[in-house]
């Protein structure tokens, strides 16, 4: 069982559902005829709700007002099975509630009731946090700028968590990210990152600069920016994009909470960062297809994943590939840039498939191709190259690697047979010591990406 400790701003998302077919005679405003009202956890509470749906145990540290809304928040948390004994009621504080007037599944007005000021019980929270941290796998901070995560408290939580060797993930707020310095990663969207860094993110160069600046300036372990309809971007050695999967977007409320919760759950479950981002991306796609703050179940995530086209399902991470059932099957591995797919590639891959039962193609990332072939390559981006390879019926899986050689990939995967071109005759093949056998296949004469590029250039 995964145990997640969350800290931040709790609130209630109050929805007033109605219809509208006339304008008020008193003022030029819509008259909404109320049909129904619903209340659910918002802010940090939505992170909790998402975590519980994923199957996590959740401990909650926060501050609410000593009022009816605060009581409702505590009851809703208890109903979700969260641990609420560490939530402090502060006299004079007004608990947060956001009331949204909804007509035809669209917001027409929002009314907020809340206090926006720093809490006065930071030292009490730090003491509680230190006492219970050992019982949790990971820490998530959800900052909505209402005052719970003051600079002092945030810095202390990061310091204590990192000292314990655990990860701390933060959904940030505001323009000053200095209080988040030293966190494992932040999950800002493009607008938030742009405001915090002081420049617009308008193209790929801006995005890479922003990711690098976030990581370096705030001493993060990893740098990530959510891109709304464009998915999620991660800075490794180069920018890696995880495309968005939502087919219809009804309401983006709470999508950031779902990303934070799902990332936290997956990382606490010892999944790799890339696989965790893939799943968080799916969860966000599920959530934006609903109206109001919502969460994504494993069933919904798997259902959306299964709706990816057949060949797209063949493009997987190394972690996913290691879980593929290989019993009784001979795994054949080959690799390359496959920049401009041509008949020579087709013939080579068909021959490789005939050697065994399962053909895995290791594909050089864009960064890797550029390092090997020069600044003008690749011609086609890694996502396009991977999709074209995966669309071939004789290719079973495509896995992208970022190094110059597939040595680490082969060492981890340990395929049965390693296939290379006949030009490797008499040469040592990278990774050969980790496979049962190396097979060399003749290329089709005159067929190469370089020749095609030169022919196009004239």
From Swiss-Prot:
Residues of the active site are 257
Q: Which reaction does it catalyse?
A: D-glycero-beta-D-manno-heptose 7-phosphate + ATP = D-glycero-beta-D-manno-heptose 1,7-bisphosphate + ADP + H(+); D-glycero-beta-D-manno-heptose 1-phosphate + ATP + H(+) = ADP-D-glycero-beta-D-manno-heptose + diphosphate
Q: Which InterPro entries match?
A: Bifunc_HldE (IPR023030), Cyt_trans-like (IPR004821), PfkB_dom (IPR011611), RfaE_dom_I (IPR011913), RfaE_dom_II (IPR011914), Ribokinase-like (IPR029056), Rossmann-like_a/b/a_fold (IPR014729)
State which pathway it belongs to.
Nucleotide-sugar biosynthesis; ADP-L-glycero-beta-D-manno-heptose biosynthesis; ADP-L-glycero-beta-D-manno-heptose from D-glycero-beta-D-manno-heptose 7-phosphate: step 1/4; Nucleotide-sugar biosynthesis; ADP-L-glycero-beta-D-manno-heptose biosynthesis; ADP-L-glycero-beta-D-manno-heptose from D-glycero-beta-D-manno-heptose 7-phosphate: step 3/4
Instruction: Kindly give the Pfam families that the UniProt entry links to this protein.
Output: CTP_transf_like, PfkB
Q: Where is this region: Ribokinase?
A: 1-311
Q: Which GO terms describe its molecular function?
A: ATP binding; heptose 7-phosphate kinase activity; heptose-1-phosphate adenylyltransferase activity; phosphotransferase activity, alcohol group as acceptor
One of the GO biological process terms: ADP-L-glycero-beta-D-manno-heptose biosynthetic process
- Its gene is hldE
The UniProt family comment states: In the N-terminal section; belongs to the carbohydrate kinase PfkB family. In the C-terminal section; belongs to the cytidylyltransferase family.
UniProt keyword annotations, A-Z: ATP-binding, Carbohydrate metabolism, Kinase, Multifunctional enzyme, Nucleotide-binding, Nucleotidyltransferase, Transferase
Role according to the record: Catalyzes the ADP transfer from ATP to D-glycero-beta-D-manno-heptose 1-phosphate, yielding ADP-D-glycero-beta-D-manno-heptose.
Q: Where is this region: Cytidylyltransferase?
A: 333-458
Q: Does the keyword Cell membrane apply?
A: no
Catalytic EC class: transferase
Q: Please verify whether the record's keywords include ATP-binding.
A: yes
Full protein name: Bifunctional protein HldE
**Subunit text:** Homodimer.
- Which residues bind ATP per the record? 189-192
Q: Might you give the EC number(s) for this enzyme?
A: 2.7.1.167, 2.7.7.70
What's in the GO CC field?
Answer: cytosol
């Amino acid at each position: 069982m995964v145990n997640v400790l969350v800290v931040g701003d709790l609130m209630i998302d109050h929805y007033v559902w109605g219809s509208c077919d006339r304008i008020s005679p008193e003022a030029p405003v819509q008259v909404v005829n109320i049909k129904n009202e619903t209340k659910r956890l918002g802010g940090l509470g939505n992170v909790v709700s998402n975590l519980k749906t994923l199957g996590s145990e959740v401990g909650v540290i926060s501050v609410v007002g000593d009022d009816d809304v605060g009581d409702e928040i505590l009851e809703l948390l208890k109903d979700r099975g969260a641990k609420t004994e560490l939530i402090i009621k502060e006299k004079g504080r007004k608990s947060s509630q956001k009331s949204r007037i909804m007509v035809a599944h669209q917001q027409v007005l929002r009314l907020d009731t809340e206090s926006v000021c720093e809490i006065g019980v930071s030292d009490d929270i730090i003491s509680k946090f230190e006492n219970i941290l050992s019982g949790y796998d990971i820490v998530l901070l959800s900052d909505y700028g209402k005052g719970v995560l003051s600079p002092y408290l945030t810095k202390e939580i990061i310091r204590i968590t990192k000292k314990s060797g655990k990860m701390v993930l933060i959904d940030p707020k505001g323009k000053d990210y200095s209080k988040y310095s030293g966190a494992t990663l932040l999950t800002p969207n493009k607008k938030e990152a742009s405001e915090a860094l002081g420049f617009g993110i308008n193209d790929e160069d801006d995005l890479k600069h922003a990711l690098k600046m976030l990581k370096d300036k705030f001493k993060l372990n990893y740098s990530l920016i959510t891109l709304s309809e464009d998915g999620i971007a991660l800075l490794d050695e180069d920018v890696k994009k995880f495309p968005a999967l939502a087919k219809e977007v009804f309401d983006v409320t709470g999508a950031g909470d779902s990303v934070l919760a799902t990332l936290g759950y997956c990382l606490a479950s010892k999944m790799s960062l890339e696989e965790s981002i893939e799943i968080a991306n799916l969860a966000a796609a599920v959530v934006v297809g609903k109206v109001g703050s919502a969460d994504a179940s494993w069933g919904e995530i798997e259902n959306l994943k299964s709706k990816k086209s057949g060949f797209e399902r063949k493009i997987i991470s190394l972690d996913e590939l290691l879980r593929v059932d290989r019993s009784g099957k001979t795994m054949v591995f080959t690799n390359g840039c496959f920049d401009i797919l041509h008949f020579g590639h087709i013939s080579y891959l068909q021959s490789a498939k005939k050697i065994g039962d399962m053909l895995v193609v290791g594909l050089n990332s864009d960064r890797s191709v550029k390092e090997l072939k020069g600044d003008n390559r690749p011609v086609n981006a890694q996502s396009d190259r991977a999709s074209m390879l995966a669309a071939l019926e004789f290719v079973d899986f495509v896995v992208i690697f970022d190094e110059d050689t597939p040595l680490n990939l082969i060492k981890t995967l340990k395929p049965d047979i390693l296939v290379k071109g006949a030009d490797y005759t008499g040469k040592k093949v990278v990774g050969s010591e980790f496979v049962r056998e190396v097979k060399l296949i003749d290329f089709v004469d005159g067929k190469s990406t370089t020749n095609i590029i030169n022919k196009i250039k004239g």
